[in-house]
């Protein structure tokens, strides 16, 4: 398995994503936003940061980058796509995930570890976790308030698309939502950073199982 780690101007978690992929026992390579193909890759990781300086709004300018057309094709083919923080914002901007990310209720940038609950462990991103297991991931965002309409929330809930919730909502996210998947289950977006949760020495290794879940799921289907 080989992950593509997308890199936009202003990305600052691309190395963390790359490291997470390598640590999970597979290959990875950086892919510039100006590229137009993802041939040779089996999964896509869209990192956090401030793509294009967050001008217009978070993820808006990245949503029209050349590589995005290929990301959409990749997702349509059922291949795994993970977007974290700014990556989640990009996935909502391009319509691969519903809802939007707004300014935190506090209007402050939040940077700390948060305890979250795995609400669905039947996805390629979470199946090595136990349902309702508490995990600790760092958060680092100013626009992490997940918003959706009541109708979209009902759909997310009915389709079991909500995979991660805050136990102590730091940003005002609707119904404590921290991470979701698309209806097909192969596209995942979350505001917390599992790629920064790989080492107990640094505070938490809760993120290891997310990347190992992705790899195990892919191998079960392709090897």
UniProtKB/Swiss-Prot annotation:
Catalytic activity: N(2)-formyl-N(1)-(5-phospho-beta-D-ribosyl)glycinamide + L-glutamine + ATP + H2O = 2-formamido-N(1)-(5-O-phospho-beta-D-ribosyl)acetamidine + L-glutamate + ADP + phosphate + H(+); L-glutamine + H2O = L-glutamate + NH4(+)
Subcellular localization, as worded in the UniProt entry: Cytoplasm
Pfam families: GATase_5
Pathway(s) of this molecule: Purine metabolism; IMP biosynthesis via de novo pathway; 5-amino-1-(5-phospho-D-ribosyl)imidazole from N(2)-formyl-N(1)-(5-phospho-D-ribosyl)glycinamide: step 1/2
SUPFAM superfamilies assigned: Class I glutamine amidotransferase-like
Catalytic center residues: 85 (nucleophile), 193, 195
Main localization, broad class: cytoplasm
EC numbers: 6.3.5.3, 3.5.1.2
SS bonds (residue pairs): none
Example GO biological process: 'de novo' IMP biosynthetic process
GO cellular component: cytoplasm
Annotated ranges, domain Glutamine amidotransferase type-1: 3-223
Assigned keywords, A-Z: ATP-binding, Cytoplasm, Glutamine amidotransferase, Hydrolase, Ligase, Nucleotide-binding, Purine biosynthesis
HAMAP family documented for this protein: PurQ
Classification via PANTHER family: PHOSPHORIBOSYLFORMYLGLYCINAMIDINE SYNTHASE SUBUNIT PURQ
Summary of subunit composition and partner proteins: Part of the FGAM synthase complex composed of 1 PurL, 1 PurQ and 2 PurS subunits.
Role of this protein: Part of the phosphoribosylformylglycinamidine synthase complex involved in the purines biosynthetic pathway. Catalyzes the ATP-dependent conversion of formylglycinamide ribonucleotide (FGAR) and glutamine to yield formylglycinamidine ribonucleotide (FGAM) and glutamate. The FGAM synthase complex is composed of three subunits. PurQ produces an ammonia molecule by converting glutamine to glutamate. PurL transfers the ammonia molecule to FGAR to form FGAM in an ATP-dependent manner.
Protein known as: Phosphoribosylformylglycinamidine synthase subunit PurQ
Organism whose genome encodes this protein: Staphylococcus epidermidis (strain ATCC 35984 / DSM 28319 / BCRC 17069 / CCUG 31568 / BM 3577 / RP62A)
């Amino acid at each position: 398995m080989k992950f593509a780690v997308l890199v936009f101007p202003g990305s600052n978690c691309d190395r963390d994503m790359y490291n997470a992929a390598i640590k999970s026992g597979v290959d990875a390579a950086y892919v510039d936003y100006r590229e137009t193909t993802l041939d040779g890759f089996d999964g896509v990781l869209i990192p956090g940061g401030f793509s294009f300086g967050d001008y217009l709004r978070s993820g808006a300018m990245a949503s029209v980058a050349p590589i995005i057309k290929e990301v959409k094709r990749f997702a349509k083919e059922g291949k795994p796509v993970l977007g974290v923080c700014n990556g989640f914002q990009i996935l909502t901007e391009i319509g691969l995930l519903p809802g939007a990310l707004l300014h935190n209720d506090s209007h402050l940038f939040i940077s700390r570890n948060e305890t979250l609950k795995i609400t669905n462990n039947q996805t390629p991103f979470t199946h090595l976790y136990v349902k309702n297991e508490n995990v600790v991931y760092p958060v680092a965002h100013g626009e992490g308030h997940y918003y959706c309409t009541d109708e979209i929330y009902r759909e997310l809930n009915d389709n079991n698309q909500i995979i991660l919730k805050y136990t102590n909502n730091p940003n005002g996210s609707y119904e404590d939502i921290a991470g979701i998947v698309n209806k097909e289950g192969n596209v995942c977006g979350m505001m917390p950073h599992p790629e920064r949760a790989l080492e107990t020495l640094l505070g938490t290794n809760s993120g290891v199982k997310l990347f190992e879940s992705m790899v195990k799921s892919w191998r079960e289907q392709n090897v």
